[in-house]
Design a protein with these regions (language model features):
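Conserved SAM-binding loop of SAM-dependent methyltransferases across substrates and taxa
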Residues: 125-137
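S-adenosyl-L-methionine
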Residues: 144-191
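Non-catalytic substrate-recognition/targeting regions of SAM-dependent transferases
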Residues: 6-22, 29-96, 103
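Conserved acidic residues
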Residues: 26, 116, 188
Length: 213
């Protein structure tokens, strides 16, 4: 089993009754987690002095209850820097568990001993993109959401990778791949972490079971 055990700015402190208590840098967040099906005593005092808590609504969605929480702040993983921004549907812009994959990407690229080109699809805020670029690869970062690509570029700048060979593409991933095939473009590695549901830049509806499987 791979473990994302190199974090210093993130940790799961406790879990109980469908929620997890996390530390993101110097801030404590409480977020729902459907995998937490057990009920245990909440003995950690930080359950009561969290900086923000996301509560689901019975009608769908939910909202954050925040106490003196900034709009965004930065956390670090090894040499990478990420902006954390609590947003809709409990997300923060970073999936800390993906760090195990970032370590794998870093290792494979460094061991290749030659230039490596990577295509990162559904690239979100750029965790895998930054890991690949920091290891020396040239990366094509593709996501349908303009805001996510802008956020990824901010993460790259914060990580000292503004000058890295990264192509930033706002496009429907499937359509982009079709065009790359027609152009005869080849990559050494393709990374994909698609959402189960989403929308393209022109409002196209994406469903994992329909559009990928």
């Amino acid at each position: 089993m791979w473990k994302a055990d190199q974090w210093k700015d993130y940790e799961v402190l406790d879990t109980s009754d469908g929620e997890k208590l996390e530390r993101w840098g110097s801030f404590y967040l409480v977020r729902p987690d459907p995998q937490v099906i057990w009920s245990t005593p909440r003995q950690d005092p930080r359950w009561k002095r969290f900086d923000a808590r996301y509560a689901r609504s019975s009608t769908g969605g939910g909202h954050w209850s925040a106490h003196h929480l900034p709009e965004h702040w930065c956390i670090h993983y090894r040499e990478l820097t990420f902006q954390v921004k609590p947003m809709n549907f409990k997300h923060t812009g970073v999936f800390p568990e993906q760090a195990a994959n970032w370590d794998f990407i870093d290792d494979q690229i460094r061991r290749a001993g030659r230039p490596v080109s990577v295509l990162n699809l559904f690239a979100y805020t750029g965790g895998a993109t930054l890991a690949a670029a920091a290891a020396g690869a040239s990366v094509c970062h593709v996501d349908a959401a303009k805001g996510m690509v802008a956020w990824a570029r901010e993460n790259a700048a914060a990580s000292g990778l503004s000058g890295a060979p990264i192509r930033w593409i706002i496009d429907d991933c499937a359509k982009f791949v079709e065009r790359e095939i027609k152009r005869g473009r080849r990559y050494d590695a393709v990374i994909m972490d698609p959402p189960s549901y989403g929308r393209g830049p022109s409002g196209e509806i994406w469903k994992l079971e329909k559009d990928l499987f």
